[in-house]
């Protein structure tokens, strides 16, 4: 398992203040470096709704669609399998507040319908989908991030999903 989180990462958009936050710009190299991955899990979209962007769910899902395409067309060695992709809708922003509040001002309104839009783009692209909103909420402290208990609950919920995917992939 390889984890590749980066604070502030967007699906396919640049951060005007912090370079290197565009997931699309490096995803193919990550796939190639980790080839062949058994599964790719994408949990992105929250940062697409920072106040520097005027995005709606459609924009974020176009970023996810571009990531899926990039993963499937990564320059891996001939004969290596293309991994299945599990797309996870992030929890809905909930009244961003505290020091991070201005950074996400209006994001909770702009992101309404994101999970539904991600579900649709995932189905259209033949990706697996999981809605984290069925298990967790955004942080009680800032309305944006996940608190430790949400991380744990999401991990517990995803463990059997991933185990089943790996068993199916391995023919078991």
Task: Cite the ranges covered by each PLM segment.
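A short beta-strand-loop structural module common to alpha/beta enzyme folds
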Residues: 1-13
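Structural motif
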Residues: 11-22
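Alpha-helical cap/lid subdomain in secreted, periplasmic
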Residues: 20-172
């Amino acid at each position: 398992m390889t984890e590749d989180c980066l604070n502030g990462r967007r699906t396919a958009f640049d951060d005007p203040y912090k370079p290197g936050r565009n997931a699309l710009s490096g995803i193919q190299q990550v796939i190639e470096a980790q080839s062949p991955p058994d599964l790719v899990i994408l949990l992105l979209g929250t940062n697409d709704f920072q106040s520097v962007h005027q995005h709606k769910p459609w924009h974020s899902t176009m970023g996810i669609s571009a990531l899926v395409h990039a993963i499937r067309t990564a320059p891996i060695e001939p004969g290596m399998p293309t991994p299945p992709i599990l797309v996870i809708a992030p929890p809905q922003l909930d009244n961003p507040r505290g020091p991070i509040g201005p950074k996400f001002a209006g994001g909770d309104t702009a992101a309404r319908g994101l999970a539904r839009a991600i579900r649709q783009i995932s189905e259209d692209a033949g990706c697996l989908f999981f809605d984290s909103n069925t298990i967790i909420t955004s942080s009680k402290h800032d309305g944006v991030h996940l608190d430790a208990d949400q991380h744990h609950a999401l991990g517990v919920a995803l463990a059997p999903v991933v185990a089943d995917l790996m068993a199916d992939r391995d023919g078991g």
